[in-house]
A protein has these predicted regions:
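A general structural signal for short secondary-structure junctions and capping/turn motifs
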Residues: 12-14, 58, 107, 208
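Outer-membrane beta-barrel pore proteins
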Residues: 41-46, 51-64, 107-111
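Glycine-rich loop at the start of a catalytic domain that most often binds anionic cofactors/ligands
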Residues: 63, 81-86
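A common structural microfeature
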Residues: 33, 48-49, 63-74, 102-104, ...
Length: 428
């Protein structure tokens, strides 16, 4: 009997994230930057929403300004050629990843000629996935729902006429809801819920070579979460006295699986560098590089409080994620005094290599194609719209290669996503 119960819990949060962004990061925090595929996001500072990428850019926001936005993420993920470990062919799975809305907002205020403050609200990590209850890989996950909310007070200071510095405190809440079937017989349902609050920081710098050219560097720290919650099980009893890994004779599944649980989840550190240049009064070009330190996510250990094992581990999944690179280039063009056109192209590297790709994380590299519009309604009020089509490379997955516990399942994944972003900015 396999000793793992299918409680690879938080791994199923990451199911089919290849259709959205590398890992489970939601890069989409600015409608204006969306139009340029986030090229120059750490140097652009067109409005307060750019402070998510670099707090130092606040020194370009004069007076009191409010930016409110939302991003609608509409992914499409399909699993084909689904096979079980005994060679049984499963049905293709359509629309695994569900659409979601990621809100964002920033209020910035100029304290004096050199000091600036702001508070930002973002949802930087999250996703929703749902498989059919009877799909072949149901023990690897059925429903996965991850939500996050981050409030970041920020401060920026114009150290010289050319150099600006910024910093912020990330206060982050994470909530997760997951379901899967028992991996012994795939009868019954396991439900896990957990949440946590923890803190991190962000740092930034911006240097303006001239009125036309500037560069920026931004860093967001990792945040180590320990999600705590409950696990509940419904269905037939599956644990018997001949299983030495669990508590003594006669222990039943419901007795073992209705318990308190915890799991560690780290949201990764990110380092970004960007450049922005005005070629003339109408035309600007920009570029961005971002390093996401996903290597902090090597193993996922899920701990329960009713095991007779020394560690209390219900399951340990080897993730072995790698650090990733994101590259983007973009351009903007003023069509007239009110309308601005934005274009961008990006390459987004996957955190998961083939040897570690699982049904929970069929991630792959992707290309971003972006465009957007900015509209200056009057001196105080402006609007931004962004659209991105993301095409992920095809991803072959065979869980037997990963050597993790649980049933074996293989599939070919095809993923894409459409992203629509809108924001309004008002300067008082």
């Amino acid at each position: 009997m396999k000793k793992v119960l299918t409680l690879t819990a938080l791994s199923t949060l990451l199911l089919s994230t290849s259709a959205m962004a590398a890992g489970f990061h939601l890069r989409e925090q600015s409608a204006a930057a969306q139009g340029n595929a986030f090229a120059g996001a750490t140097a652009g500072a067109e409005n307060g929403s750019y402070a998510y990428y670099n707090a130092a850019g606040l020194t370009r926001q004069k007076g009191l300004q409010v930016n409110l936005g939302a991003t609608y993420i509409a992914p499409r993920a399909t699993a084909k050629n689904v096979m079980s470990e005994n060679g049984t062919r499963g049905a293709d799975v359509e629309n695994v990843v569900h659409a979601a809305v990621s809100p964002n907002g920033t209020v910035s205020y100029q304290l004096n000629d050199r000091a600036f403050a702001a508070i930002a609200v973002n949802s930087p990590f999250g996703m929703i996935t749902k498989y059919d209850r009877d799909w072949i890989g149901s023990d690897h996950g059925i429903t996965s729902d991850l939500k996050s909310g981050t409030i970041t007070p920020m401060f920026a200071y114009k150290a010289t006429d050319k150099l600006s510095l910024g910093a912020g405190v990330q206060m982050q809440y994470v909530w997760a809801h997951l379901t899967s079937s028992h991996n012994y017989s795939r009868t019954g349902l396991v439900t896990e819920n957990g949440n946590d609050f923890d803190m991190g920081y962000q740092l930034g710098a911006m240097y303006e070579f001239s009125d036309a050219t500037r560069v920026g560097v931004g860093y967001r720290s990792k945040i180590d979460h320990k999600l705590k919650g409950k696990m509940k099980s419904s269905g037939s009893a599956l644990i018997t006295s001949d299983n030495p890994d669990y508590a003594g004779a006669g222990m039943q599944a419901n007795a073992l699986m209705n318990q308190k649980i915890s799991a560690k989840l780290t949201t990764p550190a990110m380092l970004s560098m960007g450049v922005y240049h005005d070629i003339n009064e109408k035309w600007a070009v920009m570029a961005e590089y971002q390093r996401v330190f996903w290597s902090s996510f090597q193993n996922l250990t899920f701990v329960g409080d009713r095991l007779n094992k020394p560690t209390g581990n219900i399951a340990q999944v080897k993730e072995n994620w790698r650090d990733t690179n994101f590259y983007s280039i973009g351009t903007s063009y003023m069509l007239d005094n009110q309308w601005k056109l934005r274009l961008g192209l990006a390459y987004d590297q996957s955190a998961v290599r083939y040897a570690h790709r699982t049904p929970r994380i069929p991630d792959s590299d992707r290309i971003w194609y972006s465009m957007g519009l900015g509209y200056q309604y009057n001196e105080n009020l402006s609007f931004d719209m962004g659209y991105t089509y993301i095409k992920a490379h095809s991803a072959k997955m065979n869980s037997a290669v990963t050597k993790n516990e649980g049933s074996h399942v293989s599939a070919d994944y095809s993923n894409s996503v459409k992203v629509f972003a809108f924001s309004v900015n008002y300067a008082f």
